[in-house]
Structure formats: structure tokens, C-alpha cells
Amino acid sequence: DKEGGSLYLLDVVGTDDTMLSDLQDREEQLLLNLGGTAVGTGINATLAYVGQVVPLLSEMTGIPFTQSRDLIDTTQNTDCYLALSSALKGCAASLSKICNDLRLMSSGPRDGLGEIVLPARQNGSSIMPGKVNPVIPEVVNQIAFRIIGYDTTVTLAVEAGQLELNAFEPVIFDSLYQGLVMLQHGIHTLNVHCLQGVRANEEVCRQEVERSVGVVTALCPKIGYNAACSLAREALRTNRPVGKIALERGLLTEQELQTLLDPAAMTSRCSLQDTEVDAVKGKM
């Protein structure tokens, strides 16, 4: 279902967008130890410099930096970078999960699921004509693998600080920068060269729904669990549709089956009507 698939993608990306936005708004991401000099004590710095350097930097950049109230702690610990790296890894992992789904759902065309068709971007093989590989999702998968590795690097670098200083900020900054750039390019590539051209293989999807035994779950509220189990066993044994067996047994009318086994209703987020939800709430 195109609408359902789009909603799923938006939900996943939206969650990560919220996480990154929350991270951006967190005060510690804008804290600076500037003015603390060597180890955060402010040695050899004038009070005028210590008091004015951060406000002047904020004015010059337009970024609302604030000076840490504990310059020693901010100099010793670089955990704020770890929070950013973790959020970046979470976003990459979510995108990689989407790409895993795309690769699996597009597998085929004969022996896989074949529920969706990805745009062909290059010849898949020099020895097998017609072979098409999901190269764009694979690219984003590999970007995610690299970003997860970067996060491990950042974690170890943050942990490796000793006493008043952390000497490993160069690899922290390089890992974060590389990860941010790669993820930005990966998202653009996935969107432009894959997602915009994805189409549903409607015939395959329709056939899979019709032959699925799992749809018997939608009949449980109407015919009961035991009767539904019996239908499932019969459908598996005879390789016949669940709906036809239910109709033959007189368990449901054809109209009831059309309503209960409607793919759109079964895949919607909640099949309860607003009035039913209100009624349930009223009984609680």
C-alpha cells in the first residue's frame, strides 16, 4: 500500500528528526569551555577575557553559545560529542532498516517477494543479463555501517581522556564531520535515486493477500479463536483461501468477509471508529 508505506517512512524519519532537534535544543550542546585556558581554571587569562569571549563569539557567529558554569568539567569531559554521535548513529540505523526492507520487498522477480519494484540504476551483472541489484539501498546500508563505526570511534575517544584533558578531540571531530556529510549525501541519494521511483507490484501484493493464511486473524473477533484456528489449518492443508472455507462453513456472509478481509482495513493503524474508541474509553 503506497499510503501505508509513505506513513511508515515518515514515522521513522520523523522520529529521528525529533531526536536530532531535541539534541540541537539541549543546552549542553552549546556550552563552551572557552576562557578556561589549559585545564579549566582560567590561569593566565584576565577576567575581562573570561567574561567577554563567549558573548563576543555568539555575537560574531549568531549562535547562542553559553559559557560553562564548570569550566574544569567541560574541559575534562567530551560527552556532549558522544550524544551527537549517538543521535547520528540512531538516524543511520533507522535509514539502514528502511533499506533492508526495500531490498527484501523488491527481491525477485521470480524467487523473492517482489512486492515492490525499485528503479534500475545500473546493470546488475556482466554474466547474467537482466539482473538488477538494489544498489542505492545497499549504498545507504554501507554508509550506516561506517557511521556506526564512527560512533564506536567517538565512544572510545571520549572514554580515553585522562584527568583534566582529552587529547583525542581530533578523531572525534573528524568522525562526526565525516558521518554527518556521508549521511547527508546518503539521504539525498536514497530519496532522489530510489524512493521517488519506487512502485508497488500491485498484482503480486493482491495475490499474496488472497493466499495468505495470516488474514484469518482479522476473523477472530467475529468467529472466535478456535474457529479461526480450524480455518487456518484447513487452508494450509488444502492450499485454499481462508475466505472461501469460511463461506462454505457458513461462518460468515460474503459481505462480512469482504469487510473483514479488506486489505486497507487490515493494514490501517487502527480499525476502531472514533465512536467505538469513545465507547471503550467510557467503559474504562
Model-derived features: positions:
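Conserved, well-structured ligand/cofactor-binding cores
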Residues: S21, E28-M284
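N-terminal functional modules and adjacent low-complexity/disordered segments of proteins
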Residues: G4, D25-E27
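Short Gly/Pro-enriched loop/turn and capping motifs at secondary-structure junctions
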Residues: G14-T15, R237
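C-terminal substrate-binding/active-site "lid" region of AdoMet-derived donor-dependent transferases
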Residues: D16-L23
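Conserved beta-strand signature within the Rossmann-like core of class I S-adenosyl-L-methionine
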Residues: K2-V13
